[in-house]
Amino acid sequence: ELMKITLVMFLAAYYDWLPAKRVSRPFWVLLPIVIICIPTALVLQQPDLGTSILLLAAGGGLMFLAGVHWAYFAAVIGSGVAVITAVFQSRGESWQLLNDYQYRRIDTFLDPAADPLGAGYHITQSKIALGSGGWTGRGFMQGTQSRLNFLPEKHTDFIFTTLAEEFGFVGAISLLGLYALIIVFCVVTAIRNKDRFSSLLTLGIALNFFLFFAVNMAMVMGLAPVVGVPLPLVSYGGSAMVVLLQAFGLVQSAHVHRPR
């Protein structure tokens, strides 16, 4: 959890120090890539594929916002396609790149109905709960899927499903609206801030925040594989909450102490 904010702080400080004319030169692009890959590799060893991918995305996104030329990202995307191809080709081989449970998650994402009582149980129950909420929901503490324990992990990764079942489409959109207000505040703070470090730091925190809630919501709706990413400010978990509040404290500091 600490690495999410530490990585953003390092990249913001790096690009604040680096002259703008050097931002896209190969040598100066390589260093932040190495710094991003080190914690990503450590998280991947846990193994936590979802968080490691989001660290890469957040780091790469901040590099783009700092002004790194788009050609580097085109090369990364091309390499990513090659890696994904290798991942699928390695399945069942002695050198397979993912664990068996990670391949099962991909299979479940592509066809959850193939094993509705096994690997596809989580996402199947999640979709049932989302659909049963309707426009206004079943009412607080009245959700059948979540309260009768049909829905696993309802207090952590799948808490958005519980909210949508009990408060319906209106409740889900209201939460999205609150998230959007936070993102807008961060972006406006970054735009108005003349200090490059504070601006990049605020944008990096906003990007991290967006990626985690977007992936969580996509995951519980079946639009992305189940990767164990919590819903910011809502899911159960002390360390994630503390780190996120620290990040928002930095945003507030950037807003209050911005050069006039």
Segments the model singles out, each with a brief description of its role:
Residues E1-A119, T161-G222, Q246, L250:
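Hydrophobic alpha-helical transmembrane segments of multi-pass inner membrane proteins, especially
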Residues E1-M3, Q45-P47, T51, G134, ...:
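Glycine/serine-rich anion-binding loops at beta->alpha junctions
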Residues R104-D107, Y121-I128, K154-F158:
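Short hydrophobic, aromatic-rich alpha-helical segments embedded in or entering the lipid bilayer
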Residues A113-M141:
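Extracytosolic (periplasmic/ER-lumenal) interhelical loops and adjacent juxtamembrane/interface segments
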Residues L130, G134-V170, F197:
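Long extracytoplasmic/lumenal interhelical loops at the membrane interface
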Residues V215-R260:
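A juxtamembrane structural motif centered on a specific transmembrane helix
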